[in-house]
Amino acid sequence: MTDAPEPRTIRFALTELAEQVDAFWQRFPGARAGDDGAAFEAEGATLWLPLAAPRARASEPVGDYAERLEARDEVQVVLLLQAGAMAFGCWRGAELMQHKAVRKYVVRGNGKSQATHLKTRGKSRYGSRLRLQNWKSLLRETNERLADCEAQFGPFDQIFHAVPVRVWPELFAVEPAPVFGRDDERLRRLPLHVHRPDHAELLRVRRQLLAGRIGWSR
């Protein structure tokens, strides 16, 4: 009885996507994308696309995907937003075109944001107005900076975000409204654990988005 071969994995960067997809196509011409478009699967091998890569269509043949890959650089945004902290970056291809990280005083002594406290416990006293004003100011600034970024560099191709579910409606409740709709097909929730937003965390998340990999067992 022979042992099963050890699975092997190689990693590649987004800049190598076209080369890696083409090579995978040549070796596994029958490979197709899964239902979520995140990877191409063949017997004994899988190519996981970088999260920042153009998404494959459900069941799309790898050859079709390879032929429609464009040489142009996409304009992509990463938005990280939590109570009292926001960081965003706008990239064209590998170039960081614009970025900003902001922190404001919106968290109560018990660690709960003022907006959440008002929803669950009612009005608080000292400092509540300041915290709530700061929170709304942060939401407005977030939308303003995204609008300015789109005005300068053109429509976003993909919008990656880590925004708590309870915060999402609040982002749409302030003026100006976001430059995207609630059900915008460009929106992609980050499938990553995100720490408190700042510039270093923004860059860490971006690096995660650029990594793809190929695994095979034969």
Task: Show which residues each predicted segment covers.
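Terminal alpha-helical anchor/extension segments at protein ends
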Residues: 1-218
